[in-house]
Amino acid sequence: VIGADILKRGNIKLMKKMNTSLIIREFNSNGPLSRADLTESTGLSPTTITTLIDEMIKDNLIMRVGEGESSGGRKPILLDLNPKHGYILSGWISGESISIALLDIKYNITDIIEKEIIFPTDENLIPEIKTIIEEIISSNNISNEKVLGLMLGISGIINQQNGTIKYSALLDLENYSIREPLSKYFSFPINIENDTNLAALSEKEFGHKHLSNYIYLMIAPEIGSGIIFDNEIYRGRFGRAGEFGHLLMEKDGPRCTCGKKGCLAPVLSQYIPINKAQKFRNAFKDLEPGSKKYEKFCDYLAVALTNYIHLIDNEAIIFGGELVKVASEKFYSDIEAKIKKYSMKNMYDNVRVLPASLSDNEVIMGGASFCFHNSKYFKNKEG
């Protein structure tokens, strides 16, 4: 009987936590909302909504933000998350710089620091990250306790479980620990993820929310892909899925940063420089549709994407990175036409080619989403 009583109390506590998480998610996606809005959108009873909202207001997690339209009676009180209740640190270590942003729990970027780091090494990378974090926390008067977590997006093969870069050709780092050394200085959770996976996640949270199976392509300042499969990041058994830039296109082609020959990244770089953002934008703008360079660039890209589609059977291809800032509608239609030409009959039906919804800070926004949804607000465990 005692055991059953403990189990019952535990189940009630867990259900309360799950319902609270559901309400927070609803505010985060659709706020501000009234209590009646929440009852309708969550399916929870008015009594449950009132009880939980009262507790969240008491904890300063929810705040009153105004009044809604009346349908014939008292105007409903509109509520929303208190953005200052918690903060998220989210960053991107690219081949050119380290960018770390401070965001509130409404995903507003309140500050961002970017520092150029041309040659990251075992010796200078961790101190550089530590310095930026300390600077952004200090200048915004945020305590460590207010930070829900840090997410860093990094090019390469990442071990999320132990916070280690298994291998990054772009950064020339192997078996390099990020979480362990940073945890000596900061008490909040520290996570790392492949940068293009985070960019793909940003589309799920902030852009093409209705899509559940798609490939996100980052084109410049690197070439990579993130795969969203059934609404989740698909990493593969060993975290190596999505290395789009290292698809073999020419067995005796130009040498890649990974040391091999003929990867897609160096093959495409023969026509447009990929690994420097500004150089890529300038070169792409100067590229004439129909020119030999343009056709070669689009051809190789379309062939690689055709192979992807044949393997994965996705519903969309989303282009991101620097390319989305300079590509015209003609580019997307040209890629689409070439994929249709190269793909097997019926394989390309219903697959769409789309520009990314976010053209800036897509890795940072995806990282913020990951941090928030893995924070204390969403840990559906007892205690």
Q: Which residue ranges define each predicted feature?
A:
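Short, surface-exposed charged micro-motifs
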Residues: 78, 90, 157, 189, ...
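Short, active-site-adjacent cap segments at secondary-structure transitions
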Residues: 70, 156-160, 198-200, 224-225, ...
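Short glycine-aspartate micro-motif
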Residues: 88-92, 147-151, 214-218, 224-226
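ATP-binding/phosphotransfer module of carbohydrate and carboxylate kinases, centering on a glycine-rich
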Residues: 1-145, 252-255, 260-383
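Glycine-rich phosphate-binding loop and adjoining helix at the ATP-binding site
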Residues: 113-213, 330-341
